From Swiss-Prot:
GO molecular function: ATP hydrolysis activity; mRNA 5'-triphosphate monophosphatase activity; polynucleotide 5'-phosphatase activity
Sequence segments annotated as region (Disordered): 1-185
Subunit structure: Heterodimer. The mRNA-capping enzyme is composed of two separate chains alpha and beta, respectively a mRNA guanylyltransferase and an mRNA 5'-triphosphate monophosphatase.
Family matches, as InterPro entries: Cet1/Ctl1 (IPR040343), CYTH-like_dom_sf (IPR033469), mRNA_triPase_Cet1 (IPR004206), mRNA_triPase_Cet1_sf (IPR037009)
Assigned GO CC terms: mRNA capping enzyme complex
Species: Candida albicans (strain SC5314 / ATCC MYA-2876) (Yeast)
GO terms (BP aspect): 7-methylguanosine mRNA capping
Protein name: mRNA-capping enzyme subunit beta
Annotated coiled-coil segments of the chain: none
Amino acid sequence: MNVGSILNDDPPSSGNANGNDDNTKIIKSPTAYHKPSVHERHSITSMLNDTPSDSTPTKKPEPTISPEFRKPSISSLTSPSVAHKPPPLPPSSSSVGSSEHSSARSSPAITKRNSIANIIDAYEEPATKTEKKAELNSPKINQSTPVPKLEEHENDTNKVEKVVDSAPEPKPKKEPQPVFDDQDDDLTKIKKLKQSKKPRRYETPPIWAQRWVPPNRQKEETNVDDGNEAITRLSEKPVFDYTTTRSVDLECSITGMIPPSSITRKIAEWVYANFSNVEEKSKRNVELELKFGKIIDKRSGNRIDLNVVTECIFTDHSSVFFDMQVEEVAWKEITKFLDELEKSFQEGKKGRKFKTLESDNTDSFYQLGRKGEHPKRIRVTKDNLLSPPRLVAIQKERVADLYIHNPGSLFDLRLSMSLEIPVPQGNIESIITKNKPEMVREKKRISYTHPPTITKFDLTRVIGNKTEDKYEVELEAGVMEIFAAIDKIQKGVDNLRLEELIEVFLNNARTLNNRLNKIC
């Protein structure tokens, strides 16, 4: 048996002397070498088993694939052409020892891979950097042909095949993995969100996060509105959230809304009834003030006792009167408390929490009117800090009062609505010279204006000539904000704004009362 017989898989010869001639005939005969068809030469088994020879037997160089290769079907894998091994190529001088690796059947070092499982497993084996470098440097690979790329596809039987693509494709971008999982709860999602990306930082806060500053105070970094009056432009956003509570697992109510306080609702209705009929030209002359004092029973001369323990509205005004004095120790405690708030505010922020104003005035009260007419009460105020002193006169008319009894606090409250009509400057001199004052009192006052709560705190010390000094505490509300809230109710825009303003105004009085309870 000679080399040609081994290559052509011929049976051994009978041993004649012309064996060399037979071998020569086989090599020279054009029909001795059976050329496989195109389909056979490009089948998966032929492509993988007939690997090009290399100097290193353990290397697995990539085969040279025709650009006209098509994906074989399932039927082609089971056809006889797949199992048929094409005859080996005739040996050439350029390849030495190619007969050892020309086929999988004659090569003991390479395992025959003629099943789909073997094909898949063979390409799924991880390759080292040395093997990849050897494959790229293989002499059998055409340098002009692009390196084939393997892609994974799923066939109808849900099995993955390795399909060779001759044209290089761009590397797809890696899609970001989803941050959240369907099984995660809210807390887990928040933690993952914090770990996945950094929060956005703003060099300048967005417009919805900036604090509003009046135009006349934009040059100064302060939170207090300029002006002597407790009037400011406030945001129209609601002050209280009536649909949420601090607890995570509790709801506000069965309806999902927090019902308003009954006392706040009644006081807001009282304010609306007295304010809604005021003419536009007289709105700035309206005063709404809350005075500290005690509701005194006329018969006993003592503070009323209604056998209640919580805040309530007292409506029987005929049997009581309101004493608007506070003790000196209480007056000083309130002054100290407001000064502490101002000091603590300045430690963390620039500007002032309150706008303070000290005054020293002398009030003279006159009653004018003819017989049979309603008397007019005129108050003439002289500013003692100015030289020459300045005189200002107003006609003050009490419209309505509302008594609020606080049995658990030192003081009750009286909510009063009044009209302060200014008297022309030319009439003041005639009033002073032609009439005798009914009462004269000298007072020194410290005013703390806090626009965010539309409140001005007036702490007054009345100096008595023959009696001891008296002390008064009153809170004055910004009426223009109240009128704006009433307009919203009449237009049907916002029905809760008025209640919010009344609640804020009352909360300031309750805060002072709670502070005074500590000194009892």
